Amino acid sequence: MAVERTLSIIKPDAVAKNVIGQIYARFEAAGLKVVAARMAHLSRVEAENFYAIHRERPFFKDLVEFMISGPVMIQVLEGENAIARNRELMGATDPRKAEKGTIRADFAESIDANAVHGSDAPETAVVEIACFFPSLEIHSR
């Protein structure tokens, strides 16, 4: 199994609910290590650049508005198959379809306010991590 890194964002809805610690506990219980982390209030430009892949999608404007609506917690997770493991923890994008016990089933409000973001592939993870963390700020442990 490969040790990977993935980007995770705890979105404004989950930050506002004060469940950061509960989400971190799930990461750690699944064998994922937080190797970089910071809280930020994204600017419109940062959110638009981060989600640029969705620029032509009908939900893009609402997604950007949501992501700049409050602080987010951004972290790099590291571990065996970190990308797939994190995606399992998150659950389906639509919390109504997410399996019981997943982050989205337990903490998300809607398909828009869905608590967390996670990289979907190794190539995406590299690009997403670089958006928020220079390599000097990431510390394997």
Curated annotation (Swiss-Prot):
Residues annotated as transmembrane: none
Keyword set, alphabetical order: ATP-binding, Cytoplasm, Kinase, Magnesium, Metal-binding, Nucleotide metabolism, Nucleotide-binding, Phosphoprotein, Transferase
GO biological process annotation, one example: UTP biosynthetic process
Uppermost EC category: transferase
Cofactor: Mg(2+)
Keyword Cell membrane: no
PROSITE patterns xref list: NDPK, NDPK_LIKE
Main location: cytoplasm
UniProt catalytic activity: a 2'-deoxyribonucleoside 5'-diphosphate + ATP = a 2'-deoxyribonucleoside 5'-triphosphate + ADP; a ribonucleoside 5'-diphosphate + ATP = a ribonucleoside 5'-triphosphate + ADP
Binding of ATP, residues: 11, 59, 87, 93, 104, 114
InterPro entries referenced in this protein's UniProt entry, alphabetically: NDK-like_dom, NDK-like_dom_sf, Nucleoside_diP_kinase, Nucleoside_diP_kinase_AS
Pfam families in the cross-refs: NDK
Gene3D superfamilies documented for this protein: Nucleoside diphosphate kinase-like domain
GO cellular component: cytoplasm
Similarity comment: Belongs to the NDK family.
Assembly and interaction partners: Homotetramer.
UniProt cross-references to HAMAP family, sorted A to Z: NDP_kinase
Protein purpose: Major role in the synthesis of nucleoside triphosphates other than ATP. The ATP gamma phosphate is transferred to the NDP beta phosphate via a ping-pong mechanism, using a phosphorylated active-site intermediate.
Name recorded for this polypeptide: Nucleoside diphosphate kinase
